[in-house]
């Protein structure tokens, strides 16, 4: 999800 994608930054 979006939250996970953000954490991968």
From Swiss-Prot:
Domain of life: Eukaryota
Coarse class of the protein's main subcellular location: secreted
Modified residues (Leucine amide): 9
GO cellular component: extracellular region
Keywords: Amidation, Neuropeptide, Secreted
Biological processes per GO annotation: neuropeptide signaling pathway
Family indicated by similarity: Belongs to the FARP (FMRF amide related peptide) family.
Organism (species): Namaquaphasma ookiepense
Location within or outside the cell: Secreted
Protein name as it appears in the record: Extended FMRFamide-6
Task of the protein: FMRFamides and FMRFamide-like peptides are neuropeptides.
């Amino acid at each position: 999800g979006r939250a996970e994608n953000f954490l991968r930054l």
